[in-house]
């Protein structure tokens, strides 16, 4: 008698819900940035900002001033090729403002700038190079955090105020000795123009930052046939001590962006501040992964045993009536690199059915067959997939260190510190 081929679809979770369209109201992933994380982020951010401003420099600026001490009615000047050589803001702080954004405050900043200059007046015209030292820089502003239509975080600088208290310029060139003797009176108009132009320049830089953020992928390919959506569901939630990001955290089959047939449920992260970052991974996130693997056929196994076929023929209720509360498993969790690694192990397998049938030789044989299939077929297949890991959400060029995992009701909690690595090339917002 030819064996009958029976396709058994097995996943990490039993998902027998009807397929329906759904709209996600709650996050699959919650990320909390604490004050400790903000403090470190500011330290790392200043390194990044220094690299950016050194690379991009400052836009040219020009103007016209009268030099009464030389009895010159006007001098037109143009400063170009402005490059920042050193950059120091030793006293800078980030403070969350509930429901609004993050307050940035800095004082005692200083910088060394090199530039080319050109001056024109009714009496003379000249050009050369100059070094400009700026000190006693005070800055304050409110960074408003929001969400773009594509689910990216956005930042907008509001209430910008900047004051440069001291400037010293040193000219170079053929007549540098002459110009340097008149440098002090020229520093006042330089300060005046800088204090007028710096806030617009900084605001433009925020536009550049938003453009870079919007280019990062919030839907990333996971394997060959699965997508993972880390987009923001809503603007960041800001309290006096932390910033919460609610991320979608949903898996999809490539080419099919239909939401899973189940909804995430709300969960609350514990009130802690010892770590820089807390990541809550909901049960929905894991169910979404299992469901998507299920749809892609990742856990498909074909059975051809005569004994299995015979048993199903004699029991028209089929496998569905037996396949509930039958397996006892352990789940191992670890964080390697930027990924959550899971592994499954089978402790015990027992068919659930009428107790009078438990002593049946055929039932025991069927139970042993399925136990072997799970132990040697399904679980190794699932673990091979799970060993690829789930990428955890983390900021650009930031690694997770000193990480710990706890199991809570309805979610996993990852507590971690951060380490900035400017050489690490990362292409995704989420992982």
Which residues make up each language-model segment?
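Short, solvent-exposed secondary-structure capping/transition elements
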Residues: 116, 122-125, 150-153, 206-207, ...
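Hydrophobic alpha-helical segments, principally membrane-spanning helices and signal/leader peptides
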Residues: 120, 125, 143, 150-151, ...
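Extended, low-charge, aliphatic-rich alpha-helical segments
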Residues: 2-112, 165-431
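Amphipathic hydrophobic-ligand
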Residues: 124-140, 318-329
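Well-ordered mid-protein domain cores that form the structural environment of catalytic cofactors
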Residues: 87-95, 103, 111-118, 130-170
């Amino acid at each position: 008698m030819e064996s009958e081929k029976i396709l058994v679809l097995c996943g990490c979770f039993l998902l027998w819900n009807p397929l329906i369209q759904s709209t996600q109201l709650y996050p699959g992933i919650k990320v909390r940035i604490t004050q400790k994380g903000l403090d470190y982020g500011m330290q790392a951010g200043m390194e990044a900002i220094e690299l950016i401003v050194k690379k991009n420099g400052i836009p040219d600026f020009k103007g016209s001033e009268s030099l009464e001490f030389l009895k010159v009615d006007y001098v037109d000047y143009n400063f170009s090729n402005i490059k920042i050589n050193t950059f120091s803001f030793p006293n800078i702080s980030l403070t969350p403002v509930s429901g609004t954004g993050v307050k940035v405050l800095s004082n005692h900043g200083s910088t060394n700038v090199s530039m080319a200059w050109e001056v024109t007046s009714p009496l003379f015209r000249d050009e050369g190079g100059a070094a400009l030292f700026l000190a006693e820089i005070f800055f304050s502003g409110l960074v408003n955090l929001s969400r773009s239509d594509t689910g990216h975080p956005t930042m907008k600088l509001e209430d910008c105020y900047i004051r440069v208290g001291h400037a010293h310029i040193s000219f170079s060139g053929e007549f540098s000795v002459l110009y340097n003797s008149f440098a002090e009176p020229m520093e006042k108009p330089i300060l005046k123009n800088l204090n007028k132009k710096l806030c617009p320049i900084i605001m433009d830089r925020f536009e550049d930052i938003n453009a870079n953020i919007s280019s990062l992928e919030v839907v990333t390919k996971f394997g060959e046939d699965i997508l993972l959506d880390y987009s923001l569901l809503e603007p960041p939630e800001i309290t006096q001590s932390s910033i919460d990001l609610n991320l979608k955290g949903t898996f999809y089959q490539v080419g099919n962006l239909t939401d899973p047939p189940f909804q995430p449920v709300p969960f609350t992260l514990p009130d802690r501040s010892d770590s820089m970052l807390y990541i809550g991974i909901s049960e929905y996130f894991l169910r979404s992964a299992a469901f998507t693997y299920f749809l892609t056929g990742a856990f498909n196994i074909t059975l051809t045993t005569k004994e299995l076929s015979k048993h199903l023929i004699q029991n028209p209720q089929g496998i569905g009536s037996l396949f509930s509360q039958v397996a006892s498993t352990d789940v191992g969790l670890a964080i390697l690199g930027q990924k959550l690694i899971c592994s499954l192990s089978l402790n015990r397998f027992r068919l659930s059915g009428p107790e009078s049938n438990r002593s049946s030789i055929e039932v025991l044989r069927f139970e042993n067959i399925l136990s072997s299939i799970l132990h040697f077929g399904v679980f190794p297949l699932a673990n091979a997939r799970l060993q690829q890991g789930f990428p955890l959400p983390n900021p650009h060029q930031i690694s997770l260190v000193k990480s710990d995992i706890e199991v809570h009701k309805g979610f996993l909690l990852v507590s971690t510190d951060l380490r900035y690595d400017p050489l690490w090339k990362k292409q995704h917002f989420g992982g």
